Design a protein with these regions (language model features):
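Basic nucleic-acid-binding alpha-helical/helix-turn surface characteristic of O6-alkylguanine DNA
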Residues: 1-121, 168, 172-201
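Non-transmembrane, interaction-prone segments in cytosolic or luminal domains
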Residues: 86-87, 159-161
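Short glycine/serine-rich loop segments
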Residues: 122-160, 173
Length: 201
């Protein structure tokens, strides 16, 4: 486990022996909460999970992840310099996260649209459950998925953080918590983007 700090918040990152990111926490107020969250989101058991964060590759990859999040929170568009380990995810969850990774900055879509693109239009709730367990928040932008009526829906980090992340990306959110329709991606556009995007894992 690598723990980094952004301002007064902690981010915990779990890294496997192949230098891939297994899971990470959202920025949290305490180191313990961040570590517990990252561990709870890990889809696989790490045989060496108590290995020292001072191992050179853990330190290097952990710093890269924290720098990615830091750049993102500054409004920049950082590029992935590390790999994600999706080994423990179900095929459905992989499909959901892959589709969500193709949603461009400045846009949102809804749970129902994601369900249709992955091939099961009745699976909106299952999509929501998969996103609630997203091992790589912010990196795989589950905050860009909202309800069909364009209200924000849920978010593990709370709705205020979801609103903040969307605003960083230039998405207009009304005081009542609804995204403006100009930012919405239809099923058709989402399908095209997901087919043409480079896979994150």
């Amino acid at each position: 486990v690598y723990v980094g700090k952004i301002d007064d918040k902690y981010i915990a990152v779990l890294i496997d022996e192949k230098e891939r990111v297994v899971s990470l926490s959202l920025p949290r107020g305490s180191e313990g909460v961040a570590v517990d969250e990252a561990k709870s989101l890990a889809p696989i058991e790490l045989s060496f999970k108590f290995r020292s964060e001072m191992d050179p590759f853990i330190r290097r990859v952990g710093r890269e992840v924290v720098e990615f999040i830091m750049s993102y929170l500054k409004g920049e568009e950082p590029k992935l310099t590390f790999k994600l380990n999706s080994d423990g995810l179900s095929s459905f969850t992989r499909k959901v996260l892959s589709v969500v990774s193709s949603i461009p900055r400045g846009f949102v879509t809804c749970y129902g649209c994601v369900a249709k693109v992955v091939g099961n239009q009745k699976a909106s709730r299952a999509v929501g459950n998969a996103l609630a367990r997203n091992p790589w928040p912010i990196i795989i932008p589950c905050h860009r998925v909202v309800r069909g009526d364009l209200t924000l829906g849920g978010y593990r980090g709370g709705l205020e953080l979801k609103r903040k992340l969307l605003r960083i990306e230039g998405v207009a959110v009304t005081p009542t918590g609804r995204v403006l329709p100009a930012h919405f991606l239809s099923t058709e556009l989402l399908s095209e983007l997901s087919q043409g995007s480079r896979k994150a894992f």
